[in-house]
From Swiss-Prot:
Top-level taxonomy: Eukaryota, Metazoa, Chordata, Craniata, Vertebrata
Region feature Pre-methyltransferase (preMT), mapped onto this chain: 43-77
Name of the gene encoding the protein in the UniProt record: Antkmt
Location of region: Methyltransferase (MTase): 43-77
InterPro entries on file: FAM173A/B, SAM-dependent_MTases_sf
Listed name of the protein: Adenine nucleotide translocase lysine N-methyltransferase
Amino acid sequence: MDQDDPAEALTELREKRLGLLEIVQAAAGSGLAVYTIWALLLQPGFRRVPLRLQVPYVGASARQVENVLSLLRGRPGKMVDLGSGDGRIVLAAHQCGLRPAMGYELNPWLVGLARLHAWRAGCSASVCYHRKDLWKVSLRDCHNVSVFLAPSVLQLLEDKLQAELPVGARVVSGRFPLPTWQPVAVVGEGTDRVWAYDVHGSGPTVSSCGVPIKAIPESSSTLVPRAPV
């Protein structure tokens, strides 16, 4: 399978056998879908987000979280997760030394769940979860960014990242690669695969004519030294 093909990645997600955790997450997702319909009809703040910029929630697996951390661990500077869902990536980032760590999520149920997880882990005073539209978050002081977003919004996200991130920042994208940026590191296989991108003085390296970059040809991972800050 072409690891960078969003259609094939989505097919693999559908074909994976569901365990108990996945079933619980699916049930939660159904509830969130009902909430989304309600929010679209009744909640003005949610209605103001264009439909093409709304991203469905799919929780990251433990392997996906670890793959993200493997590309960020040891780096200085603020870490943010855009569309942080139930907060698992932010909490894990804080626990492995990425500080400050914070998440931005528009869905109030998920923000509440993230804060509950942080409280249960004894980290409620150390990690921050904000209920805020990720498109309105300023990234000018962020040096480490993680995203697990749908392919339909990644092109627009590239524009925001390039306009706002400081030199030396690193972006890690899970499940799907950024469409025109060239990764400096790739870890994992299949739906657990994540891509790292570094921002340089002239901006990130992009492919010619906007053609998506193919994954770095390694069986499991390819790593490079972290970007200077």
